[in-house]
């Protein structure tokens, strides 16, 4: 907050202008309705998944505990950007103060970083379940799961605490127009009138590290899973193992692919329009897709949903 105040004193201005999605749309009202519906579906889908996991005893396992954490992150993730964007469209306002921008940036970085590490933790959980089934209850007991989940949230917040203060401390005098629908680090950094090349290099290295550690864990886990599945004699066992892992791999590819584009590709690959479309995909659409991916192909989740609906219908 002190850095943001110093920045405001230096520039004499405290508001950014979010250019957003709606300026380029021929039908902004229709786009607003679509995004609002998607937002509600994301919240309701993830909330239902959390409720099912909490209420159904058959889903009280480490795998579903981590899925519930992912749903919680997705609900917070989409809530950081979409409500502000829709409210601005309704009110006809596109300004965001520096403190609000910094807070949005911090929450976004924290949640994105936490999800990176959570997806790696989920891959490790699948490795233990498939490769060491007899030791699974001991290796992944409730205390270990809580520790791993807490570690994911903590490591994600490190990214937010590192990048947000530095980004918001730069003097902004070229322009105050953020060509994005929220305060994303690259979109804000480009507005600075000071030399940010060193910071961009450090940010790149930080993002590589944030991606490299989880990707290494995920790759190693699935390599060992493939070796174990290959040695299985039971075709049914192979099918179940692949079904369990395919949902997680789908989410990993969607989320990490978008992150690699945003933070690791050279600036020559980027345009404001491309960046916004990619951001729409992983900040708005991914939270909608995750509960569908984890539930539609999961017999236990669908069984719990049918049971809950049957009980409510009978009552």
From Swiss-Prot:
According to its UniProt record, where is this protein mainly located? membrane
**Family as reported in the entry's similarity comment:** Belongs to the G-protein coupled receptor 1 family.
Alphabetized UniProt keyword annotations? Cell membrane, Disulfide bond, G-protein coupled receptor, Glycoprotein, Membrane, Olfaction, Receptor, Sensory transduction, Transducer, Transmembrane, Transmembrane helix
Kindly indicate whether the keyword Cell membrane belongs to this entry.
yes
Mention one GO biological process in which this protein takes part, according to its record.
Answer: detection of chemical stimulus involved in sensory perception of smell
Q: What is this protein called?
A: Olfactory receptor 2T29
Function text = Odorant receptor.
The protein's organism comes out as: Homo sapiens (Human)
Q: Where in the cell is it found?
A: Cell membrane
Q: Which residues lie on this side of the membrane: Cytoplasmic?
A: 54-61, 125-143, 224-240, 297-315
List the Pfam families.
7tm_4
> Which cysteine-cysteine pairs are annotated as disulfide bonds in the entry?
101-193
Write down the glycosylated positions: 3, 9
Q: Does the keyword Transmembrane apply?
A: yes
Q: Which domain of life is it from?
A: Eukaryota
Q: Example GO molecular function term?
A: olfactory receptor activity
A single GO CC term, please?
A: plasma membrane
Which regions face the Extracellular side of the membrane? 1-29, 84-104, 163-199, 264-276
Membrane topology category:
Multi-pass membrane protein
């Amino acid at each position: 907050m002190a850095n943001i105040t110093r920045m405001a004193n230096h520039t004499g201005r405290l508001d950014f202008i979010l250019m957003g999605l709606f300026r380029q749309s021929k039908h902004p009202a229709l786009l607003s309705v679509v995004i609002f519906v998607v937002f509600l579906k994301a919240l309701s889908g993830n909330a239902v998944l959390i409720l099912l996991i909490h209420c159904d005893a058959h889903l009280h396992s480490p795998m579903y505990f981590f899925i519930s954490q992912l749903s919680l992150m997705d609900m917070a993730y989409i809530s950081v950007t979409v409500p502000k964007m829709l409210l601005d469209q309704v009110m006809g306002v596109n300004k965001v103060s520096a403190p609000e921008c910094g807070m949005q940036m911090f929450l976004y970085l924290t949640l994105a970083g936490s999800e990176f590490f959570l997806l790696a933790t989920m891959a490790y959980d699948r490795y233990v379940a498939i490769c060491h089934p007899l030791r699974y209850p001991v290796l992944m007991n409730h205390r270990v799961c809580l520790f791993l989940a807490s570690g994911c949230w903590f490591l994600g917040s490190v990214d937010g605490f590192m990048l947000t203060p530095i980004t918001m401390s730069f003097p902004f005098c070229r322009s105050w127009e953020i060509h994005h629908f929220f305060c994303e680090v690259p979109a804000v950094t480009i507005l600075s009138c000071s030399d940010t090349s060193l910071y961009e290099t450090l940010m790149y290295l930080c993002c590589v590290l944030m991606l490299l550690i989880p990707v290494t864990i995920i790759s190693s886990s699935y390599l060992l899973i493939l070796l174990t599945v290959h040695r299985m004699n039971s075709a049914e066992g192979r099918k179940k193992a692949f079904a369990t892992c395919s949902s997680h791999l789908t989410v990993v590819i969607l989320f990490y692919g978008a992150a690699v584009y945003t933070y690791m590709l050279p600036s020559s690959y980027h345009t404001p329009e491309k960046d916004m479309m990619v951001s729409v995909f992983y900040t708005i659409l991914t939270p909608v897709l995750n509960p569908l991916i984890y539930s539609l192909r999961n017999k236990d989740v669908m069984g719990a949903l049918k049971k809950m609906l049957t009980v409510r219908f009978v009552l």
